[in-house]
C-alpha cells in the first residue's frame, strides 16, 4: 500500500482548519475535511494578533486549544475516509501563524496548534514548526510552497507560475527547463485586507465570490498610493504577513491621503491591489510566463479571478484543478509532502526562494504514542 500522509493548516482568515489525506508519488488526494473555527476562538486569535501585547497564559492556552482542534480535524478526516491511524505515516501540521517577521537582526515566526497535543490525541507522528529552521539558516521562512509546486506542477513544455492566494499571496516561477532553478516570493496581500475590510463593515469573514468588491468601483488614486509601499519594489527573496499588511496599514494610508470612499469602493480597490501586485511581480521577475495556475481561497473569488485574467492577458490563467489538485487543498497537500520530506531526511526549503544559506530539513518530529495507535 502506498504511504499516506495528512496535511493540516489554518490560513490567515482563520475561519477553518483544513485537512487532506494523501498518497504521494504519485499524488492522490484520498479525502479532505474542514472544521470551522468557532467565532469565540477566532476572536481570541485576532485579538492576540492585533494587540501589541498578550499574556503568556493566553498564548499557551490558545496553543493547546488549537492543538486539540487540529487533532479533532485529523481524526474526523480519517473517519470520513474509513482509514485507520496505523495507515498514516505522519501528519504535517503548519499550525496557525500568529506572527511572522523575517527582517532585522532577530527574525522569527510563531505558529500555534501544539504538535505534542496533536500527536498524543491522534496517535500519529506529527511534524510541525516548518519555518524556523529556514529562518535560522538565514532565510525568510517563506514561502515554502514553491518546493511542492516544483515537485508536482512543473511542466517541461511551458514557463509556468503557481500563485497561491491565501491571506498573503505567494508565487512560484517554474521554468520549463528543469536545469533552471525555480524561484518565488510573497507578492503582497492576497485576501487579508479584503477579509479584514468586509469583517469591519459587514461582519462577514470573507467576500464570497468577490460580490462586494464587484459592487464597488476601483479608485485609481488610492490604488497608486497603495502600490507605493516599499514592499512591492523590494527584490526577492522576500516574505510578508498580516503583521504588515493589515487594516492599521490601510487606515494609515486612508488618513494620510484624505481620500474618502464608500466601503464597497475601498473593497474594489483592495481587490485591484492584489491583482496589480501580482502583475507587477510577474512582469518584473518572469515576463515570459506562459501559464499561471491559481490556488488558495482566492481562486473562489470570481471578481479577483476575472481581474487577473484581464490584467494578465499575456498568459493563460487557470486554477490547479486543471492539473488534478483542487485549489483549496494545495496547501494541505504541501504540508503532507513536507512531512514526508522531513521523515525521510530530505530538505524542504529552496534557498533560491527563501534566501537561506543552504537547504535544510524542516520542522520537528513529535513521535506517535504507540499505546494510542494500537487502540485504533
Curated annotation (Swiss-Prot):
UniProt keywords (A-Z) are: ATP-binding, Carbohydrate metabolism, Kinase, Nucleotide-binding, Transferase
Entries under InterPro entries matching the protein:
Anhydro_N_Ac-Mur_kinase (IPR005338), ATPase_NBD (IPR043129)
* GO molecular function annotation: ATP binding; kinase activity; phosphotransferase activity, alcohol group as acceptor
What reaction is this protein's catalytic activity? 1,6-anhydro-N-acetyl-beta-muramate + ATP + H2O = N-acetyl-D-muramate 6-phosphate + ADP + H(+)
GO terms of biological process kind: 1,6-anhydro-N-acetyl-beta-muramic acid catabolic process; amino sugar metabolic process; peptidoglycan turnover
Q: What are the binding positions for ATP in this chain?
A: 11-18
EC number, as in UniProt:
2.7.1.170
**Top-level taxonomic group:** Bacteria
Q: In which pathway does it act?
A: Amino-sugar metabolism; 1,6-anhydro-N-acetylmuramate degradation; Cell wall biogenesis; peptidoglycan recycling
A Pfam family that this protein carries is AnmK
Q: What does this protein do?
A: Catalyzes the specific phosphorylation of 1,6-anhydro-N-acetylmuramic acid (anhMurNAc) with the simultaneous cleavage of the 1,6-anhydro ring, generating MurNAc-6-P. Is required for the utilization of anhMurNAc either imported from the medium or derived from its own cell wall murein, and thus plays a role in cell wall recycling.
What family does the Swiss-Prot or TrEMBL record give for this protein?
Belongs to the anhydro-N-acetylmuramic acid kinase family.
Instruction: Return the NCBIfam families for the record.
Output: PRK09585.1-3, PRK09585.3-2
Name the record gives this protein = Anhydro-N-acetylmuramic acid kinase
Source organism: Nitrosococcus oceani (strain ATCC 19707 / BCRC 17464 / JCM 30415 / NCIMB 11848 / C-107)
Amino acid at each position: 500500500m502506498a504511504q499516506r500522509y495528512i496535511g493540516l493548516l489554518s490560513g490567515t482568515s482563520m475561519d477553518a482548519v483544513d485537512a487532506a489525506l494523501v498518497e504521494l508519488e504519485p499524488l492522490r488526494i484520498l479525502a479532505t475535511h474542514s472544521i470551522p473555527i468557532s467565532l469565540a476562538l477566532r476572536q481570541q486569535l485576532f485579538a492576540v494578533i492585533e494587540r501589541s501585547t498578550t499574556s503568556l497564559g493566553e498564548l499557551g492556552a490558545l496553543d493547546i486549544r488549537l492543538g486539540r482542534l487540529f487533532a479533532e480535524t485529523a481524526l474526523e478526516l480519517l473517519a470520513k475516509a474509513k482509514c485507520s491511524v496505523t495507515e498514516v505515516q505522519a501528519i504535517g501540521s503548519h499550525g496557525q501563524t500568529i506572527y511572522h517577521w523575517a527582517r532585522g537582526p532577530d527574525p522569527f515566526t510563531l505558529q500555534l496548534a501544539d504538535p505534542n497535543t496533536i500527536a498524543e490525541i491522534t496517535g500519529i507522528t506529527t511534524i510541525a514548526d516548518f519555518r524556523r529552521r529556514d529562518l535560522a539558516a538565514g532565510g525568510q521562512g517563506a514561502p515554502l510552497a514553491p518546493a511542492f509546486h516544483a515537485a508536482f506542477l512543473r511542466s517541461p513544455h511551458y514557463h509556468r507560475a503557481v500563485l497561491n492566494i491565501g491571506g498573503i499571496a505567494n508565487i512560484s516561477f517554474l521554468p520549463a527547463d528543469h536545469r533552471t532553478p525555480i524561484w518565488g516570493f510573497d507578492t503582497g496581500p492576497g485576501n487579508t485586507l479584503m477579509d479584514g475590510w468586509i469583517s469591519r463593515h459587514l461582519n462577514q469573514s470573507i467576500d464570497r465570490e468577490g460580490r462586494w468588491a464587484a459592487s464597488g468601483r476601483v479608485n485609481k488614486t488610492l490604488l497608486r498610493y497603495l502600490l507605493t509601499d516599499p514592499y512591492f519594489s523590494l527584490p526577492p527573496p522576500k516574505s510578508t504577513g498580516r503583521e504588515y499588511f493589515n487594516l492599521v496599514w490601510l487606515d494609515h494610508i486612508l488618513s494620510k491621503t484624505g481620500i474618502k470612499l464608500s466601503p464597497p469602493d475601498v473593497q474594489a480597490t483592495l481587490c485591484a491591489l492584489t491583482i496589480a501586485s501580482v502583475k507587477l511581480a510577474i512582469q518584473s521577475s518572469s515576463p515570459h510566463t506562459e501559464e499561471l495556475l491559481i490556488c488558495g481561497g482566492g481562486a473562489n473569488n470570481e471578481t479577483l479571478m476575472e481581474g487577473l485574467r484581464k490584467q494578465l492577458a499575456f498568459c493563460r490563467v487557470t486554477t490547479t484543478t486543471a492539473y488534478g489538485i483542487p485549489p483549496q487543498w494545495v496547501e494541505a497537500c504541501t504540508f503532507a509532502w513536507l512531512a514526508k520530506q522531513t521523515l525521510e531526511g530530505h530538505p524542504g526549503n529552496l534557498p533560491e526562494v527563501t534566501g537561506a544559506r543552504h537547504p535544510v530539513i524542516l520542522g520537528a518530529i513529535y513521535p506517535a504514542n504507540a499505546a494510542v495507535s494500537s487502540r485504533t
